[in-house]
Design a protein with these regions (language model features):
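Catalytic phosphate/metal-binding cores of nucleic-acid and nucleotide-processing enzymes, i.e., regions
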Residues: 3-49, 67
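Basic/polar N-terminal segments that are highly enriched at the extreme N-terminus
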Residues: 1-3, 94
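Short, low-complexity, polar/charged sequence segments that are solvent-exposed and flexible
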Residues: 41-44, 53-55, 83-87
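Aromatic- and Gly/Pro-rich amphipathic surface segment
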Residues: 46-66
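Short, compact, well-ordered microdomains
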Residues: 59-94
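Intrinsically disordered, low-complexity, compositionally biased regions/tails
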Residues: 12-14, 43, 55, 60, ...
């Protein structure tokens, strides 16, 4: 479900930072959306980080934006030029 109000990426980013989900209007029927993964701190206890840091090392996991894909998987997301300039971003509720 979405609000139907369209906006640019600057507003979309502010909505993401406020904890809301956003999508491009064309993605909506596919169940895709972006969301913020907040930063956290954890101790290394398994690969692949266990091959980089000694076990028990405290690591800072930085906040970032992930995408729920049409297949239901979660992937890191990076904006394209067309995403940055688009004016068809919408809030996703639920």
């Amino acid at each position: 479900m979405n609000t139907g109000i369209k906006f640019g990426f600057g507003i979309a980013l502010e909505e993401i930072k406020a904890g809301h989900k956003v999508a491009r209007d064309g993605w909506n029927g596919k169940g895709m959306f972006l969301f913020l993964v907040p930063g956290s701190t954890f101790k290394v206890n398994r690969p692949p980080l266990l091959g980089i840091y000694p076990e028990g090392t405290e690591v800072n996991y930085q906040p970032h934006v992930d995408m729920k894909t049409a297949q239901g998987t979660i992937v890191p997301w990076l904006a394209s030029q067309s995403d940055l300039l688009a004016e068809d971003w919408i809030l996703v509720e639920g």
